[in-house]
Amino acid sequence: MNLKIIKTDDGSDTLYNKKLDETYHSLHGSVTESKHVYINAGLSSVIDENSKGPISILEVGLGTGLNLLLTLKFAKKNDLKIQYHAIEPFPLDNSILKKLDFNNKLEGFDKKIYKKIHHPKNLEPVKLSEHISFTKSITRLEQISFEKEKYDLVFFDAFAPSKQPDIWSKENFKLIREAMKTSGVLVTYSSSGKLKKILEELKFNIEILQGPKGKKEMTRATK
């Protein structure tokens, strides 16, 4: 098997991809990292701008679904309506999914909802809760015809640029930018020089923020 479950420092699980020699999340804590990058620096930052309507989120790299689980929890707590579209060309096998453990770090973790996240039909909307409508595209980002100016927020959570550089291409970020609303926000754990250069060339407003534990910096970019 190409994937191995690893317990991270905050007690939550992540996956190690042997082929890429890369983990899905930080070994310092998968929940800790995802909450810092995608919820605190991402979702929290767009609430005021979208208080009167649903927030539209695009995630590049659904992976274990952890960012979506944290979004579900945040949406319930803050009574938000969210339309969530995730791209994942390589969905995880059920034999791995059923062994992943987030119970100890995610209060109210619902296995029925988790099953819906990982087994919806391609592009068929699924209502995960009264707060979130979810769509999953089982394909590569560059193969999607995006609606223009649709997304308020983008979670870019693909494998590292050093491992899968093609995903971090200027062409892909151009597609994403066109799909973002004016003042839309993109957040990612990466702060690589190549990423900064691409975002600058595409006229994003870039903020280099403090990273989660074990990582000095992360990136937030606004259209």
Annotate each language-model stretch with its function.
Residues I96-E147:
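S-adenosyl-L-methionine
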Residues F155, T182-S190:
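Conserved beta-strand signature within the Rossmann-like core of class I S-adenosyl-L-methionine
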Residues G65-L69:
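Glycine-rich SAM-binding Motif I of class I
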